[in-house]
């Protein structure tokens, strides 16, 4: 493949095959640096099969290089355990489809030549923006087509595979590409999705860059009568398990430690998270396959970062160990092209511990597992606009009912001193259930602002943050995945109404997220959540009537609300599919949750979210930039000093004559330290 292509060559190209090669040329020169392209070529050609001068990869070479297990999937019913995620055939199907871009209908499945692999890497690492001005950053329709394997014409797939095989070696290609036969990788025709016209932007932009729109339109008109495509649950599950396992993968990090020799517990945890995502689809979709409209809506709204792990996975092609200068300096010789280097996992790579974003602290999580954190990374926002792992976010343990007890005083002491966004995770089961793992329900909420008493609910921030990271999220992880994104209208106002705060906290009623708080209830609260104005300081009497307290408690509002009682023993998730876009949250996606879920809480945890240093350092009163952990420790030290000071003052009150006692008492009452006014003070610090 040449380094460049002349304009006359582009004008002379008229067939999809010629235009496909020219697009690969343009991708290679515009989307990779010269060094990356050199490494890419070395990786490809040092491993490629050669049949009469035709160089290509088969499934085994691709799986071995990416360290994606390609063995026989071990079913639990068969007994035994091979520690593998059998995703190799699925990845190969995807790559064979994407290699034909933008002529998937006439050229897919494609043989994995260097030109095809160039397009695959550009598409999966989202580097196409350097060439395709009109290209959209979501690849949902393209990825759906690469996975669709239900509802296709077997005759067409067989013909396409035979045509592809003839262009290479009939004997070798048929032997090595057994998984490709019967793959349904042509373009889906689920044209009832609302945004189907916009979803062709990538392909249109690609052909527009080559002045070949008419050829593309001709290709799109071929075979409009093909059956509606669907993704089988088995295919989707295997891909999900791979994505969950490699979600923490960093650029050029060894993949082996995430995909090989998983323990039975680790593989079961990965499978459980995959099953909760699959359970969010309808019974018909689970039985007959997932259609494009449902797939696109679910991925776009509730799993926007699902395919992010594919980026660092395929970026491995852009670095060759054969060209590692440090190895050359030590005198190590390069493997010869006739003997392709083996990508078998080494013991050192397998034994190396996977990356974790959970920091050590006052407790170890009784809820979160590495697979669950991977699940969270598929939809939780970050200020960078990327997922949790790619944003270098860390989770700091702040509060746990297991470690700190179920006291709201302890909750205030640990949570209200955390001056950064946080993640609330609740795990429990339905009342009367046995509490087995299959019956556990896991709920959570992303709180974008610190828990603190405040006289303002402003969304103004000194940093230019990504909008999604400034919105709250309510979600359920188990037994069915579902997400309620924050209402974007929250970003359009500086003051959030005091009757509908994001979070409301009271020692009387507990914790309420996304609820409506009656004005009468605000007069009786003792603590306040983020963005909730403090009431006027007026003396009041506590209500003793239980019924009266219930009437003044937070009420479910909008599309979703979470209410946790003051004893941290029970939780209620309220879902409304008729509320449209009113309230703090937008409707649940997928819409599979019951309207009311009542659970007995087993564990409740708060995890602080620490952004990269450039974003998480905020100045203190002296103008010194400090992270959230340091500021929390300083708050605890201040509280401890205040407690000692007050203790000393109380001792002095006991001595002296009555006049001195009354004067000291009056002084403390005016300061709000003791007396009725002290009872009304918000509990931001304890």
From Swiss-Prot:
Report whether DNA repair shows up as a keyword of the record.
no
- Write out the biased-composition intervals (Basic and acidic residues): 155-176
Q: Which domain of life is it from?
A: Eukaryota
Q: Where in the cell is it found?
A: Cytoplasm
List the InterPro entries hit by this protein, alphabetically: TLDc_dom
List all Acidic residues biased stretches: 188-198
Q: Name one GO cellular component term.
A: cytoplasm
Q: Which residues does the UniProt record annotate as the domain TLDc?
A: 366-610
Is this entry keyworded Glycosyltransferase? no
- UniProt keyword annotations, A-Z: Cytoplasm
Q: Where is this region: Disordered?
A: 155-198, 326-355, 522-559
Question: Which residue intervals are annotated with compositional bias (Polar residues) in the record?
Answer: 544-553
Ranges in coiled-coil conformation: none
Q: Which family does it belong to?
A: Belongs to the RTC5 family.
Q: What does this protein do?
A: May be involved in a process influencing telomere capping.
What protein name does the entry list? Restriction of telomere capping protein 5
| Species for this entry | Talaromyces stipitatus (strain ATCC 10500 / CBS 375.48 / QM 6759 / NRRL 1006) (Penicillium stipitatum)
Recite the lineage of the species: Eukaryota, Fungi, Dikarya, Ascomycota, Pezizomycotina
């Amino acid at each position: 493949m040449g380094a460049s292509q002349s304009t006359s060559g582009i004008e002379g190209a008229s067939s999809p095959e010629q235009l496909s090669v020219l697009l690969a040329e343009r991708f290679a020169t515009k989307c990779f640096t010269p060094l990356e392209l050199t490494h890419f070529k070395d990786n490809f050609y040092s491993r490629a099969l050669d049949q009469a001068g035709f160089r290509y990869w088969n499934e085994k070479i691709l799986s071995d290089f990416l360290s994606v297990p390609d063995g026989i999937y071990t079913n639990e019913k068969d007994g035994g355990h091979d520690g593998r995620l059998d995703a190799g055939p699925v990845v190969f199907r995807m790559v064979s489809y994407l290699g034909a871009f933008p002529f998937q209908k006439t050229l897919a499945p494609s043989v994995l030549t260097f030109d095809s692999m160039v397009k695959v890497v550009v598409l999966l690492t989202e580097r196409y923006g350097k060439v395709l001005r009109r290209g959209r950053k979501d690849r949902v329709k393209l990825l759906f087509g690469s996975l669709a394997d239900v509802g296709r014409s077997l005759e067409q797939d067989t013909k396409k595979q035979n045509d592809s095989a003839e262009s290479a070696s009939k004997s070798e290609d048929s032997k090595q590409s057994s998984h490709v036969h019967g793959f349904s990788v042509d373009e889906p025709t689920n044209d009832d999705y609302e945004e189907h016209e916009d979803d062709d932007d990538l392909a249109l932009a690609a052909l527009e860059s080559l002045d070949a729109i008419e050829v593309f339109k001709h290709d799109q008109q071929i075979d409009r009568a093909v059956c509606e495509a669907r993704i089988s649950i088995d295919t989707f599950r295997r891909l999900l398990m791979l994505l969950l396992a490699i979600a923490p993968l960093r650029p050029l990090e060894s993949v082996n430690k995430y995909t090989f020799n998983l323990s039975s517990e680790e593989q079961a945890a990965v499978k459980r998270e995959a099953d909760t995502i699959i359970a969010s689809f309808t019974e018909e979709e689970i039985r007959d396959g997932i259609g494009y409209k449902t797939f696109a809506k679910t991925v776009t709204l509730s799993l926007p970062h699902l395919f992010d792990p594919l980026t660092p996975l395929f970026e491995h092609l852009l670095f060759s160990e054969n060209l590692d200068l440090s190895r050359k300096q030590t005198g190590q010789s390069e493997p010869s092209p006739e003997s392709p280097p083996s990508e078998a996992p080494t013991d050192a790579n397998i034994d190396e511990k996977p990356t974790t974003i959970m920091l050590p602290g006052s407790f170890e999580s009784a809820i979160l597992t590495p697979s669950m954190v991977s699940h969270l990374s598929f939809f939780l926002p970050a200020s960078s606009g990327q997922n949790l792992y790619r944003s270098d976010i860390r989770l700091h343990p702040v509060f746990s009912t297991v470690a700190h007890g179920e006291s709201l005083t302890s909750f205030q002491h640990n949570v209200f001193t955390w001056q950064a966004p946080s993640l609330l995770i609740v795990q429990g089961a339905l009342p009367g259930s046995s509490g087995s793992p299959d019956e556990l329900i896991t709920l959570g909420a992303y709180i974008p602002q610190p828990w603190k008493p405040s006289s303002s609910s402003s969304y103004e921030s000194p940093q230019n943050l990504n909008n999604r990271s400034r919105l709250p999220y309510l979600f359920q992880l188990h037994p069915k995945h579902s997400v309620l994104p924050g209402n974007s209208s929250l970003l359009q106002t500086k003051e959030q109404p005091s009757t509908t705060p994001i979070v409301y906290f009271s020692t009387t009623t507990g914790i309420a997220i996304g609820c409506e708080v009656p004005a009468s209830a605000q007069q009786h609260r003792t603590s306040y959540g983020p963005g909730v104005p403090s009431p006027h300081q007026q003396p009041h009497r506590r209500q003793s009537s239980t019924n009266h307290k219930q009437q003044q408690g937070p009420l479910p509002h909008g599309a979703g609300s979470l209410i946790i009682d003051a004893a941290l023993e029970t939780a209620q998730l309220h879902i409304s599919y008729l509320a449209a876009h009113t309230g703090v949250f937008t409707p649940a996606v997928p819409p599979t949750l019951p309207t009311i879920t009542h659970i007995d809480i087993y564990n409740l945890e708060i995890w602080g979210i620490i952004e990269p240093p450039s974003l998480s350092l905020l100045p203190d009163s002296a103008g010194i930039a400090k992270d959230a952990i340091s500021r929390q420790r300083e708050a605890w030290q201040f509280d401890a000093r205040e407690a000692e000071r007050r203790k000393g003052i109380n001792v002095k009150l006991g001595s002296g004559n009555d006049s001195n006692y009354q004067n000291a008492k009056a002084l403390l009452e005016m300061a709000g330290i003791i007396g009725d006014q002290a009872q009304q003070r918000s509990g931001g610090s304890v």
